[in-house]
Regions:
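Active-site pocket scaffolds in enzymes
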Residues: 229-257
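Buried hydrophobic-core signal for structured, non-transmembrane domains
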Residues: 14, 66, 127-131, 256
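Acidic, contiguous internal or C-terminal segments within carbohydrate-active enzymes
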Residues: 99-154
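Hydrophobic residues positioned within well-ordered beta-strands of beta-sheet architectures
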Residues: 3, 12, 93-95, 113-115, ...
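Surface-exposed, gly/pro-biased binding rims or lids
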Residues: 101-105, 171-172, 252-257
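Active-site/ligand-binding surface loops and adjacent short beta/alpha elements
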Residues: 141, 149-235
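Extended, loop-rich substrate-binding clefts of extracytoplasmic carbohydrate-active enzymes
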Residues: 65-67, 72-122
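Beta-strand-rich N-terminal accessory domains
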Residues: 1-64, 71-73, 215-237
Length: 257
């Protein structure tokens, strides 16, 4: 089961599980699909929402106020929970996940997590996250992220290496270094970009897990040298940008997280 909406130009589909975006099709481009298809040979997801943790927890356990909690799944639990559709119009959908006994067994906070999708002008999709601390006395600790995958290449006459990421302004972002298990080392190193703005895609870029950047520009475009199709993502308010596909593979997608 999924919910859909259209503005006559784009068609979007979202499923209640994880409030996960399944599809963005461009009707003006013969229903061209932009979102990764979820082919299990590479990665079975499409665009999971990450809450209340990002990545793994060391040992799958953590302690809060003297109590130990176990959560071995990657990227929290929201991606695996069924959200409620609380608002739906022709061009907007809002999904809600509230804390319950099951969530409090692994995450001891009262919360509401809202994910809103909007179809806006000029072929623009808006995604808005709202995290509400329902408790009047307890401070709430959480992490929040977005993990959308996009098809690369977008056209049958192109290949993965025809694509590149282009940032909106020249900078030298810092690449956050990870251990082999995907944990932070605490170190970072400069990532030199072509002309200060461009990263050409190659499958071997991801042989050692994701490229995680801090201090990058807050707008990045996925483009092809053919100039046929692409997309632009704005991520104001987020500290880090992750770039990933399945490591040591020829996966035909890239995630901009």
């Amino acid at each position: 089961m999924y919910y859909s909406m259209t503005d006559g130009i784009l068609i979007m589909a979202v499923e209640p599980k994880g409030a996960e975006l399944l599809s963005i099709c461009d009707m003006t481009q013969k229903n061209k699909e932009y979102v990764w298809t979820g082919d299990e040979r590479y990665w079975k997801s499409h665009a999971p929402n990450l809450f209340p943790f990002i990545g793994r927890i060391l040992g799958g356990r953590y302690t809060y106020r003297g109590a130990e909690y176990e959560l071995k799944s990657r990227h929290g639990f929201a991606r695996d929970r069924k959200f409620s559709l609380v608002a739906h119009s022709e061009t907007s959908m809002t999904f809600s996940l509230r804390s319950d006994e099951e969530t409090k067994a692994v995450y001891p906070f009262d919360f509401e997590f809202l994910v809103r999708y909007d179809l806006q002008k000029n072929k623009t999709v808006g995604v808005t996250y709202t995290v509400r601390n329902v408790s009047e006395t307890e401070k709430m600790i959480f992490a929040l992220g977005s993990h959308p995958g996009y098809r690369v290449p977008l056209n049958p006459d192109e290949k993965f290496e025809d694509y590149f990421l282009e940032f909106s302004e020249p900078r030298v972002p810092q690449r956050v270094l990870l251990t082999e298990e995907g944990f932070l080392t605490g170190d970072a190193e400069p990532l030199e970009l072509e002309d200060g703005i461009r990263l050409r895609l190659r499958h071997d870029l991801f042989d050692h897990d994701a490229i995680v950047l801090k201090n990058s520009a807050k707008t990045v475009a996925l483009m092809s040298k053919s100039g046929k199709n692409g997309l632009r993502m704005h991520f104001d308010g987020f500290e880090l940008l992750g770039i990933w596909h399945t490591n040591k593979s020829d996966a035909p997608f890239v995630c901009l997280e």
